[in-house]
Amino acid sequence: MIDFGNFYSLIAKNHLSHWLETLPAQIANWQREQQHGLFKQWSNAVEFLPEIKPYRLDLLHSVTAESEEPLSAGQIKRIETLMRNLMPWRKGPFSLYGVNIDTEWRSDWKWDRVLPHLSDLTGRTILDVGCGSGYHMWRMIGAGAHLAVGIDPTQLFLCQFEAVRKLLGNDQRAHLLPLGIEQLPALKAFDTVFSMGVLYHRRSPLEHLWQLKDQLVNEGELVLETLVIDGDENTVLVPGDRYAQMRNVYFIPSALALKNWLKKCGFVDIRIVDVCVTTTEEQRRTEWMVTESLSDFLDPHDPSKTVEGYPAPKRAVLIARKP
């Protein structure tokens, strides 16, 4: 059983304490009613992982943990087998005591694009919305954040996060809660809020931007990364049944339109800091994610288009401030 008690104790002593008015009841309800059919199998994989304290831990340049003495072949095999029980691994990579988890996404590439444009994360309390396995939260901690809180309702991601945390010596500087942002009260408590790869999955993108704003302190920073298309401030793609084989893609604006949306929601100092096409080197099938990936979603005769005929995935990073 994954225990959230450490997180409750942690926030009871800081400026997130008002969250305790609603959070424990939400988590108790989730534990009672909403668990996935494979959750016990996944949580058992976490439970059977060895307790290891890393001798060397690098979260600044990667997510890497090493022991003082090399682990035995049997210990490494045990870790690898248990981590493979948590496949598919989408966000990473992780290097843990000789087990190299080559995830579908090179999330480190995205982090390298985002990091130079951020306000200094030192001492900050951060919310990562749709955090997946938690890879970027560990990189936030490596960049000096005091506390990183991730929310993602996908229960496999929760177990992946807890598995990595256990192999990082049960590090309590990052926490993942199995919730969606619509379940959060307006906490107004985070110095930086990240929403990366979420906006296009929301039926109401402006409502999502308001929800993000409600989590920020005044003068807090929003980091927004999402799919975009080329065009002016009035250009928005509303895909039909699917986009790149995904059913749950609703709105893909131009970067300029997205800037206007942020302005409409009351954000200021809005900057488009990066725009790049997603490549099949950054998102691809691996031994740790063996099903279809980006190359299967693109037109085989014209990789500038999806199989549906839409522009191929292009992503923008925007940074804005809540006044």
Curated annotation (Swiss-Prot):
Q: Name one GO molecular function term.
A: transferase activity, transferring alkyl or aryl (other than methyl) groups
Stated EC number for the protein is 2.5.1.-
List, in alphabetical order, the GO biological process terms annotated in this UniProt record. Answer: tRNA wobble uridine modification
Q: State the similarity comment.
A: Belongs to the class I-like SAM-binding methyltransferase superfamily. CmoB family.
What function is annotated for this protein?
Catalyzes carboxymethyl transfer from carboxy-S-adenosyl-L-methionine (Cx-SAM) to 5-hydroxyuridine (ho5U) to form 5-carboxymethoxyuridine (cmo5U) at position 34 in tRNAs.
Its quaternary organisation is: Homotetramer.
Task: Identify the PANTHER family for this entry.
Answer: PUTATIVE (AFU_ORTHOLOGUE AFUA_2G14390)-RELATED, TRANS-ACONITATE 2-METHYLTRANSFERASE-RELATED
This chain belongs to which protein, by name?
tRNA U34 carboxymethyltransferase
Protein species of origin:
Escherichia coli O139:H28 (strain E24377A / ETEC)
Gene behind this chain? cmoB
